[in-house]
Amino acid sequence: MKFSANWITSPKDSGAAVYTYQKSFSLRSAVKKATLYISAQGVYVPTLNGARVGAFVMAPGWTCYKTRTQYQTYDITNMLKEENTLSVGVGQGWAVGHIGYANTNHYFADFVALICEMHIEYQDGAKEIIASDESFDIYTSPVTFSEIYHGETCDMTAPIELVGKAKLTTVNTELVEQVGEDVTEQERLRPIALIITPKGERVLDFGQNMTGYVEVKVKGNRGDRIVIHKAEILDQDGNFY
């Protein structure tokens, strides 16, 4: 598909934080079919009216971004209401963040960017395209640092602030339709053991190696800080490695 949308980015450099790109819109009448086409320079998570769109993790996926970047296609027909808000969190990912084999940041690109468009077909035959442009609002998010190889920092007390209107930009890549399978969550694992190491560290053992992330529910006071470190093994003395 050839995009009619523009690449957009934040008027302020987001650094390693995740900014939210947001667009509110109204429907003219009853909808027959609606499709979202979307990609990013970085990684993105889309929501529509507060619900997650699709299940792809780390979209748009790994490619050589200097030559091609995949885009995803989502059927959003049943997610639409009379009044709607599309929100897309965009982070650095591989394109902008740290790349291990190159031992550098910004190996493919210097800034995050988003491109998307919604194709809406109404039951009366009318058609509409809502595309990324300068009308998108950019907001901060609780994710103040996000890096594939260096973890994530979330400040749930941080106020959500309007950064400004999106600005148009140029991304030197070819947008191509996704060629592989979706990368999605496959299972939810619970720890099989709680280990107290000789140093007094509390280690949750999940019983296997994996690619994933931790979900935790906690009680505490405003300003409390929770730090989770991950490792594959313990050292020879049984301490966290």
Model regions and ranges:
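Extracellular/oxidizing-compartment recognition motifs
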Residues: M1-Y241
